[in-house]
């Protein structure tokens, strides 16, 4: 999986996905909630 955030040298996720606390992309509250690093509300 593509790494994002701190673990991925500041990379953002494709398709407006949230960057979770462990540096992986996803769209569930696990990624978008507590610990989210970027695009936590999509690409607005």
UniProtKB/Swiss-Prot annotation:
Q: Which UniProt keywords apply?
A: Antimicrobial, Chitin-binding, Disulfide bond, Fungicide, Plant defense
Q: Which domain of life is it from?
A: Eukaryota
Cysteine-cysteine disulfides: 4-19, 13-25, 16-43, 18-32, 36-40
Instruction: Give this protein's Gene Ontology molecular function annotations.
Output: chitin binding
Read off the InterPro entries from this record.
Answer: Chitin-bd_1 (IPR001002), Endochitinase-like_sf (IPR036861)
Keyword Disulfide bond attributed = yes
GO biological process terms, alphabetically, are: defense response to fungus; killing of cells of another organism
Cell membrane keyword on record:
no
Q: Mind telling me how this protein is modified after translation?
A: Contains 5 disulfide bonds.
**The protein's name in its UniProt record:** Antimicrobial peptide 1b
Species of the source? Leymus arenarius
List the top taxonomic levels of the source. Answer: Eukaryota, Viridiplantae, Streptophyta, Embryophyta, Tracheophyta
């Amino acid at each position: 999986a593509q790494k994002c955030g701190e673990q991925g040298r500041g990379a953002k996720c494709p398709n407006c996905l949230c960057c979770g606390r462990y540096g992986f992309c996803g769209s569930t509250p696990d990624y978008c909630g507590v610990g989210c690093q970027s695009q936590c509300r999509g690409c607005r």
